[in-house]
Swiss-Prot record:
A biological process from GO: endoplasmic reticulum organization
Stretches forming WD repeats: 5-45, 60-104, 115-155, 161-201, 203-246, 250-290, 293-333, 374-397
Protein known as: Protein transport protein SEC31
Broad class of where this protein is predominantly found: membrane
Membrane topology label: Peripheral membrane protein
Lineage: Eukaryota, Fungi, Dikarya, Ascomycota, Saccharomycotina
Gene (name only): SEC31
Family as reported in the entry's similarity comment: Belongs to the WD repeat SEC31 family.
Tree of life domain: Eukaryota
Keywords: Cytoplasmic vesicle, Endoplasmic reticulum, ER-Golgi transport, Membrane, Protein transport, Repeat, Transport, WD repeat
Positions with biased composition (Low complexity): 774-789, 930-948, 968-990, 1044-1057
Organism: Meyerozyma guilliermondii (strain ATCC 6260 / CBS 566 / DSM 6381 / JCM 1539 / NBRC 10279 / NRRL Y-324)
C-alpha cells in the first residue's frame, strides 16, 4: 500500500531508525520535465507526526548523484554519516545530525575526495564495520575508504577479468572483509580484502547488472541480468559456483536493482527497465507478487533497514514511491461506485487504480508465529498453537487473577442498580484496614444517608444552639427517620433558630407634671429642648449625637427619615467599633452575614454554620456560604490537621460541593495506596492492586454521595476534569476485568465531549458486542453552569467554583495524578441575604419571559451623594467600592399600570464555548481575591424603588424595546461622565471610603399630587427559606442591598449621548446615581449580545428570590440639576420632555491612528516598552495549540498602547499602578504582579476595557513560559 510519494527524480538511501528518515539526491543521467540542470540533497521525515510534505533538510549541490549511502550511527555521529557519489568522480561525506540541526551543507561536510578518475556509480557502507565504505565507478576503479581516518582510499587488488565500469558493489553480511562487484564485463567478482585479491568470479550467458548477499549465510548471493531479451534473477551458492541454484523469471526487460531483506531471507525485491517492482522468494525460486508499475524505468529499490515492512522505489518518471509490503487498501470496485458515466470518469481520474497483485501469499518472518499468547480486553486470554496438521488453533478463555476484584465490582454494581449504598457504607466503616481519615468520610456519608442533608446540617449547628437554650439535640424521630420540615405545631428546627418571642413590656404612658425650664440646663441641653419643641427632629438628632446622647438619638430616629436612622446607626457602630457584640448586631441588623462568613474566626465554625443556616435566603445561598466556610477552614493553616480536614469535609458535604470533596479524596489517593501496600492485606500484592483498590474506594464514596443527594445528571462545570479523569480511568480498569456493563454505567456520568470518552465507549461496545448508545449527556462546552461563587450547580451534587474577576480562569493549585486537585484558595464572594417585602400596586399579568438578553440598567448620570462614614472601613481605602450596591433610580409615572411580575425570571446562564479567547486552566494557579464586607442596610421604608443590584442581572419586562442588534461580546468600557448635584459637591474622601456603608435610598412619598391616593399596597413576603426564622413583620425587614433591582414600569433602549442636550424626565433627576460596577456588563455589552442568548449572570449567588411586584411610582417633582453631557434616561412614552440646554462642547484632543506609537508621553513609555518586550519574549515559547491565545493577547495589548498613544483613557494614578505591575513582571515576581493587577481592576475599573484581559493573559503566559 502506498504510504507517501516524493516528486523527485532522485536516488535515495534509508537510515537505520525504526521510523526511518530518507535522504534523496538528484540522480545523474535524468532529464527533468523543465530541463533543469540543478541538483539538490534532501532529507525527508516520511513518518513525521505533523504529516509535513516538506523535507527537514534541503540544499543545492554542484553535481548530480549516481548513488547515496547512509551508515549506521557511530561514535560521535548519532545519526550516522551520509555519503554521496557524484557524476564528476567526487565522493563527499556529511554528518547527518549537523545537517539537520544547522541546515548548513558546508558545516556538516566531513570529507571530500576526487580519487576516482571518472563518475562514481555505486557505493555501500560495511554492515559489520560502519566506518568502512566501498565505492566503484568507471575505468573499473574500486576503492575502500575508512571514514575514521579520512585518508586516501585503498584498492582491493587486481581483478582477474578487468571491467570497464563497476555498476554495483555489495558487502557480505556475515564476513566483514568479503564483498562482491559486478559490471559491464559480464562477470560478478568476489573479493577478499585480507588477501587483497579477487578470489572468485561468476559468469552467465547474460551480463550482470546488480548483486546482493544472503542476509545470514556468507556463501550465498543473488545476481540479476540487465539484458532486455532475457531478464533473470539468479541465486548462487559459492560452494558450487559453476551454476546458479535458482533462476527466476518475471521481468520483461533488464533488471536495474535488487535488495535482499535483512530480516527475512525468503523476501527479495527487484525493479527494472520494464517499470515494474516485484517481490520474490529467492529460497524457493518463486515470484510472490508485483507492485504497481511506474511510468518510466524503476532504477532503484530498497527496504528500510530497521523497518522491513517499508520499502521505496525510485523511477525516472520523477517519483520516489514509499510503500508497505502488505496492501490494506480497498478494492477498486469499492473506490469507484457511481453508476453515472460522467461521474465515473470524474472519479476514475482522481482514484488510484493500480494495486499490488500477489500470486503467492506468504507472511514475512517477523509476522510468523508457531504459537503465541496475548491478554485480550475484558480479562481474556487468547492463545494460538498448531495442531498435528500444522493448522492454527485459537483459544479464548477468561482470565481472573484476583477474585477479590470481581467480588468488589459485583457489590458495587448491585449498589448502583438498587441505588442503595448502605451495605457498602457499613462494610467500609467496619473494615479495620481503612485509615481513620477514610473511616471518618464513610461515617459522615453514613450520617448524611441516615438523616438527609437537612438533618445533617441540624446536627452541625444543633449542639451550639440547643446548649445555649439548655436542650439536647434531637436530630431524628424515634423510628430513625428524618422529621418533616413542616410538622404540626411549627416545630421545624430552622424555624426555631429565629428570635424568641420578646417578653411584653407595658406601654409607657407619661404621668404627672414636669418642667421645661431651661434656665438650669446646659447650653447643649437647651439647644436640644428648643429643637424638640420646634419639631426639628432631624436637628435634634444631630445635637444628641454631638453630645454623645446616643440613647436619645436612637429613640428620636425611630420615627425619623431613613437618612437620620442611618446616621444614628453609624454613630452607634462608630462608638462601639471594637465591640464583638456590636459587630454581630451590625451583621444581624443588615440580614447579611457575609462579614461573619468571611472574617469570623473559623475556630467557631459551628457557630458560623448556625448563622448561615439562620440567615440564608435559599438552599443555593446556604450551599455557597457553607462551602466558603469549608474553604476557610482548609486555608486557616498551611498544613491543615485531620480535624480541620474533617470539619471542612462536613461543610462541603452540607454544601453539595462535589468538586471540593472529590479534590480532597483524589489528593489523598497516593497516600491511601501507600498504606494499602504496607498493610498485610492478601488482596493487595502489587502497586496495580493498590491503585485499583484506592480508586475503587474513591468511586464508591463519589457514587454513594451522589446517591444520597439524589444527583442523577451528568457531571458538569469548569473544574470537573480531575473527577472525569478518575472516572474514565476506573471505567477502563473495570472493563479490563470484564465488567463491561458496570464500566458503561460510569461512562454515562461523563460529558459527551470529554476527551477519550468516545473511544472508550466504542471499545467497550465492541468487546461486549453491543451498539454504542446515543449519548444523552450534555456537552461541557455547550451547556454552562451559572456564573456565581461557590454556589450550587444546576447539576445536583456538583458545586461550581468561584467566579473570578475579569477573564481569569480556573487553574490547578498543585500537581496531582488527576490535575487541579490541590487545595485551592477560596475566592471572595458576596452573599445575597433575604429579600424584604415591599408594597406594590395592582398590575396586569406579565408577558412571558423572552429568551432575548435583558436590557442593562442605565447608570445615573447625575452623580452620587456622599455616603455616611463607615466605622469598619479600613484606613486609606479607595473611594470606589465595587461591592457597594448602586442607589435606586425612581421610576417615572406611567399612563397605565405596569405588568406584574408573574413568576421568577429564568436564571441567566452563559453559553460556555470553551473559548479560544480564554486562558487555559493549566496555564496558571488561581489566586483568591479579597472582598469587601457587606454594607449596612438602612431601616425599612416603603420607598418607591429598591437599590439596584450590582451582582444580579436586571429583570426584563414586557415594556422593553425590541432585541438589541447582534455584535461583539466584549467592548471596551469607558467612564460615564457624571454631573454632581447641588446636594453632593463636597463629599469627603473619608465618607467615600466605605466598605460597610449603607446603600442610599429615596424616602417614601408622603403625599400624592391632586389628592389621589395610591392603590392599596399589598405586602409580599420573600420566598420561604427553610433554614431561616420566619419574619414577624414584612415592614420591619431591612432593605436588601444585594437584592436585584425591581423592573421599572417602562424601560426603553438607552439613547446615544448627545452633546448640548440634557435629558429631562417628569419625575426630576435622581439624586443618587449608582456607583460604577466593574463586574457587571456594560449597557453596550448587554445590548450587543447575540440574539437568543442570555448574558451570563454576574451575581455572586444569582438573582434574589422573585415573587415581587413593582412599587408605586414616586411623586413627580424636583429640580433639574446642572446640565452636562449625559445619557438619555429611560422614560415612559407619555413623559413630557424638557427644553434642551445648549452646551459648548469641550475641545477635542487629536486622535492618532491605531498602531502609532510615536506620541506615547514620557510618563507612559515605560509601560509600552516593558509590556512589548515581554510579549516578544513570550510568543516564541507559547505551545502551538495556544497560539490563538497569544495572538489575542497581543491584539488586546495594542488597544492599551493606542490609549497610551492618545493619552485618552488612563489617569495618572492608573498609569502609576500599571508601572508597578510592569516592574513586578520584569522582576518575575508574578504573584505580586497578579495582585497588583487585581488591585488595578478594583480601583480603576472604569479605565479597563478590551486591553485588560490581554495584560492578565500576558502575566499568566509569562509565568508559564519564561
Amino acid at each position: 500500500m502506498k504510504i507517501e510519494e516524493i516528486s523527485k527524480t532522485s536516488t535515495f538511501a534509508w537510515n537505520n531508525d525504526p521510523l526511518p528518515l530518507l535522504a534523496s539526491g538528484t540522480v545523474a543521467g535524468a532529464v527533468d520535465a523543465d530541463f533543469s540542470t540543478s541538483s539538490s540533497l534532501e532529507i525527508w521525515d516520511i513518518f513525521s507526526a505533523t504529516n509535513s510534505k516538506d523535507p527537514i533538510f534541503s540544499a543545492s549541490v554542484d553535481n548530480r548523484f549516481y548513488a547515496i549511502a547512509w551508515s549506521k550511527p557511530s561514535e560521535g555521529r548519532s545519526k550516522g554519516v551520509l555519503a554521496g557519489a557524484f557524476e564528476n568522480g567526487t565522493i563527499e561525506l556529511w554528518d547527518v545530525q549537523e545537517l539537520i540541526t544547522s541546515k548548513d551543507l558546508q558545516k556538516a561536510s566531513i570529507f571530500k575526495s576526487s580519487a576516482h578518475s571518472g563518475p562514481v556509480k555505486t557505493l555501500q557502507f560495511n554492515p559489520l564495520q560502519e566506518h568502512v565504505l566501498l565505492s566503484g565507478g568507471s575505468n573499473g576503479q574500486i576503492f575502500v575508504w575508512d571514514t575514521k581516518k579520512l585518508s586516501d582510499p585503498v584498492a582491493p587488488g587486481k581483478a582477474m577479468t578487468p571491467m570497464d565500469e563497476i555498476s554495483c558493489v555489495s558487502w557480505n553480511n556475515s564476513v566483514s572483509h568479503i564483498f562482491a562487484t559486478t559490471g559491464n564485463s559480464g562477470y560478478t567478482s568476489i573479493w577478499d580484502l585480507k588477501s587483497k585479491r579477487e578470489v572468485l568470479h561468476l559468469s552467465y550467458s547474460a551480463n550482470f547488472s546488480c548483486v546482493a548477499w544472503h542476509p545470514t549465510q556468507s556463501t550465498k548471493l543473488v545476481t540479476a541480468t540487465g539484458n532486455d531479451s532475457d531478464a533473470l534473477i539468479l541465486t548462487w551458492d559459492l560452494k558450487n559456483a559453476n551454476a546458479p541454484e535458482k533462476i527466476m523469471r518475471g521481468h520483461k526487460k533488464g533488471i536495474l536493482s535488487l535488495d535482499w531483506c535483512k530480516q527475512d531471507p525468503e523476501i527479495l525485491i527487484s525493479s527494472g527497465k520494464d517499470n515494474a517492482t516485484m517481490l520474490w522468494n529467492p529460497i524457493k525460486g518463486e515470484k510472490l507478487g508485483e507492485y504497481p508499475t511506474t511510468a518510466n524505468w524503476a532504477f532503484h529499490t530498497r527496504f528500510a533497514p530497521a523497518a522491513p515492512e517499508i520499502f521505496a522505489t525510485a523511477s525516472f518518471d520523477g517519483k520516489i514511491v514509499i510503500q508497505s509490503l502488505q496492501d490494506t487498501s480497498p478494492p477498486m470496485t469499492s473506490k469507484v461506485t457511481t453508476k453515472n458515466d460522467n461521474d465515473f470518469w470524474n472519479e476514475i481520474s482522481t482514484t488510484e487504480t493500480q494495486q499490488p497483485v500477489f500470486t503467492v501469499h506468504q507472511a514475512p518472518a517477523w509476522l510468523k508465529r508457531t504459537s503465541s499468547v496475548s491478554f485480550g480486553f475484558g480479562s481474556k486470554l487468547v492463545s494460538i498453537s498448531l495442531d498435528s496438521d500444522s493448522h492454527s488453533v485459537v483459544k479464548i478463555q477468561p482470565f481472573v487473577k484476583n477474585g477479590a476484584v470481581s467480588e468488589t465490582t459485583s457489590k458495587f454494581s448491585q449498589a448502583l442498580k438498587s441505588n442503595d449504598f448502605k451495605d457498602i457504607i457499613e462494610a467500609r466503616i467496619s473494615d479495620a484496614r481503612h485509615s481513620k481519615t477514610d473511616k471518618a468520610d464513610w461515617e459522615i456519608l453514613s450520617k448524611l444517608s441516615g438523616v438527609g442533608k437537612e438533618g445533617f446540617l441540624k446536627e452541625i449547628v444543633s449542639t451550639e444552639h440547643e446548649q445555649a437554650n439548655g436542650k439536647k439535640p434531637d436530630v431524628s424521630s424515634e423510628d430513625g427517620t428524618e422529621p418533616s420540615r413542616k410538622e404540626e405545631g411549627d416545630n421545624d428546627f430552622f424555624e426555631q433558630l429565629g428570635e424568641s418571642p420578646i417578653k411584653s413590656i407595658p406601654n409607657f404612658v407619661p404621668e404627672g407634671k414636669f418642667s421645661i425650664d431651661t434656665s438650669d440646663q446646659s447650653e447643649a441641653d437647651k439647644t436640644i429642648i428648643k429643637l424638640l419643641l420646634s419639631n426639628k427632629i432631624e436637628d435634634a438628632i444631630s445635637a444628641c449625637l454631638d453630645q454623645k446622647k446616643l440613647s436619645a438619638a436612637l429613640v428620636l430616629a425611630l420615627d425619623a427619615s431613613p437618612e437620620s436612622k442611618a446616621k444614628v446607626r453609624n454613630a452607634y457602630f462608630t462608638n462601639t467599633k471594637g465591640d464583638e457584640i456590636a459587630r454581630l448586631i451590625y451583621n444581624a441588623s443588615s440580614k447579611n452575614i457575609t462579614d461573619i462568613v468571611a472574617n469570623a474566626d473559623v475556630k467557631s465554625w459551628k457557630e458560623i454554620a448556625a448563622a448561615i443556616a439562620a440567615f440564608s435566603t435559599d438552599e443555593s445561598d446556604l450551599s455557597s456560604k457553607i462551602t466558603e466556610l469549608g474553604d476557610r477552614i482548609v486555608q486557616a493553616s498551611e498544613n491543615p490537621s485531620t480535624e480541620d480536614r474533617n470539619n471542612a469535609m462536613i461543610c462541603y458535604l452540607a454544601g453539595n460541593a462535589l468538586e471540593k470533596i472529590a479534590s480532597i479524596w483524589l489528593r489523598e489517593l497516593p497516600e491511601y495506596e501507600k498504606s494499602l501496600l504496607e498493610s498485610p492485606d492478601d488482596d493487595v500484592s502489587t502497586p496495580s492492586d493498590a491503585h485499583f483498590k484506592s480508586l475503587n474506594n474513591f468511586m464508591e464514596k463519589l457514587l454513594a454521595y451522589r446517591s444520597i443527594t439524589k444527583a442523577n445528571d451528568t457531571l458538569g462545570g469548569p473544574s470537573i476534569e480531575p473527577i472525569c479523569n478518575a472516572i474514565l480511568e476506573y471505567a477502563n480498569l473495570v472493563a479490563g476485568y470484564g465488567q463491561f456493563e458496570l464500566a458503561d454505567s460510569f461512562l454515562q456520568l461523563l460529558p459527551s465531549d470529554f476527551a477519550g470518552l468516545k473511544t472508550e465507549k466504542d471499545r467497550i461496545s465492541r468487546a461486549s458486542g453491543t451498539k454504542v448508545q446515543a449519548s444523552n449527556t450534555r456537552s461541557t462546552t455547550s451547556k454552562a453552569t451559572a456564573s456565581r461563587s461557590y454556589g450550587k450547580s444546576p447539576v445536583p451534587g456538583a458545586s461550581v467554583p468561584p467566579t473570578l474577576p475579569g477573564n481569569q480562569t480556573f487553574a490547578p493549585a498543585a500537581s496531582t495524578p488527576y490535575g487541579g486537585l490541590a487545595g485551592q484558595p477560596a475566592a471572595s464572594s458576596v452573599l445575597t441575604p433575604a429579600t424584604p417585602s415591599f408594597p406594590s400596586m395592582p398590575q396586569p399579568p406579565q408577558a412571558p419571559v423572552s429568551n432575548r438578553p435583558p436590557i442593562a440598567s442605565t447608570p445615573s448620570i447625575y452623580g452620587k451623594p456622599a455616603p455616611v462614614g463607615n466605622p469598619y472601613a479600613p484606613q486609606g481605602a479607595t473611594a470606589f467600592n465595587p461591592y457597594k450596591p448602586p442607589a435606586p433610580v425612581a421610576p417615572e409615572p406611567v399612563s397605565a399600570p405596569p405588568p406584574a411580575v408573574s413568576g421568577p425570571p429564568k436564571p441567566a446562564y452563559r453559553q460556555e464555548t470553551e473559548g479560544w479567547n480564554d486562558l487555559p486552566d493549566a496555564f496558571k494557579q488561581k489566586t483568591s481575591t479579597r472582598r469587601a464586607a457587606p454594607a449596612a442596610v438602612v431601616s425599612p421604608s416603603l420607598s418607591p424603588a429598591l437599590p439596584a443590584n450590582n451582582f444580579a442581572p436586571p429583570k426584563r419586562n414586557s415594556a422593553v424595546a425590541g432585541p438589541p442588534p447582534k455584535g461583539s461580546r466584549s467592548s471596551s468600557r469607558t467612564a460615564v461622565p457624571t454631573i454632581p448635584t447641588a446636594a453632593s459637591p463636597s463629599a469627603s474622601t473619608a465618607q467615600l471610603h466605605s466598605r460597610y456603608a449603607p446603600p442610599q435610598s429615596f424616602n417614601a412619598p408622603t403625599e400624592v399630587s391632586n389628592g389621589s391616593g395610591s392603590p392599596t399596597p399589598s405586602v409580599h413576603a420573600p420566598p420561604k427559606n427553610p433554614y431561616a426564622p420566619a419574619a414577624t413583620s414584612s415592614t420591619n425587614l431591612p432593605r436588601n442591598q444585594y437584592a436585584p433591582s425591581v423592573p421599572t414600569p417602562s424601560v426603553q433602549q438607552p439613547q446615544t449621548p448627545k452633546i448640548g442636550h440634557a435629558s429631562a424626565t417628569p419625575s426630576g433627576p435622581s439624586p443618587n446615581g449608582p456607583p460604577k460596577n466593574p463586574y457587571a456588563p456594560t449597557a453596550q455589552q448587554v445590548s450587543m449580545s447575540p440574539s437568543g442568548m442570555v448574558p451570563p449572570r454576574t451575581g455572586s449567588y444569582g438573582a434574589a428570590p422573585s415573587g415581587v411586584t413593582a412599587p408605586p411610582p414616586p411623586k413627580v417633582g424636583g429640580v433639574l440639576p446642572p446640565p452636562g453631557p449625559v445619557l438619555t434616561q429611560p422614560r415612559s412614552r407619555n413623559a413630557s420632555a424638557a427644553a434642551p440646554v445648549e452646551l459648548t462642547p469641550p475641545p477635542t484632543k487629536p486622535k492618532y491612528p491605531a498602531g502609532d506609537r510615536s506620541h506615547i508621553p514620557e510618563k507612559s513609555i515605560q509601560i509600552y516598552t516593558s509590556l512589548d518586550s515581554l510579549t516578544q519574549a513570550v510568543k516564541p515559547n507559547v505551545p502551538e495549540r495556544f497560539i490563538k491565545h497569544a495572538e489575542d493577547m497581543e491584539k488586546r495589548l495594542n488597544f492599551l498602547y493606542d490609549h497610551l498613544n492618545n493619552d485618552d483613557l488612563l489617569s495618572d494614578d492608573a498609569i502609576a499602578e500599571l508601572k508597578k505591575v510592569c516592574s513586578a513582571v520584569e522582576a518575575k515576581d508574578y504573584a505580586t504582579a497578579t495582585q497588583l493587577n487585581v488591585d488595578f481592576a478594583t480601583n480603576h475599573s472604569e479605565q479597563t476595557g478590551k486591553w485588560y484581559p490581554g495584560l492578565k493573559r500576558l502575566i499568566s503566559m509569562a509565568e508559564a513560559t519564561l
